[in-house]
Amino acid sequence: MESVKLTRSDLPERGKVIEVFVEGRLVCVVNLEGELYAMDNVCPHWGGPLGQGTLENGKLRCPWHGWEFDPRTGETTRKAGVKVPTYELTIKGADVYIEMTKK
């Protein structure tokens, strides 16, 4: 498994979502109530950029058509069995690492 260290600029503020390049691809990083989560940046509905979405009531909302995803699991309530792949984040001291193997 390959871990990549994220820089402080790669980490969103509490309640925010950002896109970051990791290993040549865009990843969505979410700060939900002070906890960090990472997932693919592509919405499975129409390919919207999830890292440009918003957090509403604990869900990540796609900016294109409003599909909502749980940042912890990648699951949506819109369609059974549909989810966005997530990535594990590990905190070691002041450093945050992303595991680039999809969960």
What feature does the model see in each segment?
Residues 10, 60, 80-81:
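Short loop/turn motifs at secondary-structure junctions and domain boundaries
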